[in-house]
Regions:
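Small cysteine-rich, disulfide-bonded extracellular modules of the LU/uPAR three-finger superfamily
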Residues: 1-169, 176-210
Length: 210
């Protein structure tokens, strides 16, 4: 058995899913018990990116050292609860970004919404296929920042934010709490959020030359 196969057998998800890297959405689901062992700060929500990066860095060290001491995401059905998805920048979001550069608009990407429609991503989309619950604001309930040339956004949804159980399959970032401009949208395999669970979105958008 090769190393990657051994890792998946030991931890329950692929080795590549431990990486937080540029231009990826990272979706992870945690139980209250595992979450409470490492997310102990009173201000976790406003440091959610830092918390996730630290946690998966420690998980990577476990990998290197052949240990299983670090808390990991839980699994749902046969789907991995931690998966990397390429960002999808929709056309309306790209146009809005260009207008910010030229001063034609003053919007910012400050909201994220989730939904139940698993339709594949397309640049022509303008929002969620089937929105569920209220959007949450990065600058209030999450974290957003720029590190070098990478814009980072982080948000946590738990059973106090959404009526559970619910199967989530999509997420969008927006410029407003309602309506507004969608910047990116992803679809992902079923994440069944239930009582005592939380889902974390870590979004990395690298600005670079083509």
């Amino acid at each position: 058995m090769d190393f990657e196969s051994e890792f998946q057998a030991r931890y329950g998800f692929p080795l590549e899913h431990t990486k937080l890297s540029a231009n990826l959405w990272n979706v992870s689901k945690w139980s209250n018990d595992s979450w409470s062992t490492f997310a102990k700060s009173d201000n976790v929500k406003n440091n959610i990116l830092d918390v996730m990066e630290k946690q998966f860095s420690e998980l990577s060290l476990d990998i290197l050292n052949g240990k299983t001491t670090t808390e990991k995401p839980i699994q749902v059905s046969n789907n991995f609860t931690y998966q990397n998805k390429f960002n999808i920048h929709v056309n309306t979001g790209l146009s809005e970004s260009a207008k910010r550069d030229t001063g034609e608009t003053s919007t910012t990407i400050d909201w994220i919404g989730v939904g139940t429609d698993g339709t594949a991503e397309s640049v022509s989309q303008t929002g969620l296929g089937s929105a569920y619950g209220n959007r949450k604001q990065f600058s209030v309930d999450g974290q957003r920042k720029v590190v070098n040339q990478t814009a980072k956004y982080g948000m946590l949804f738990d059973d106090s934010d959404l009526t559970v159980p619910i199967t989530l399959r999509e997420a969008c970032t927006f410029t407003a709490s309602t309506s507004g401009i969608c910047h990116h949208r992803i679809s992902y395999s079923d994440f069944v959020l239930d009582t005592g669970e939380r889902i974390v979105f870590s979004i990395y958008e690298l600005m670079q030359n083509g």
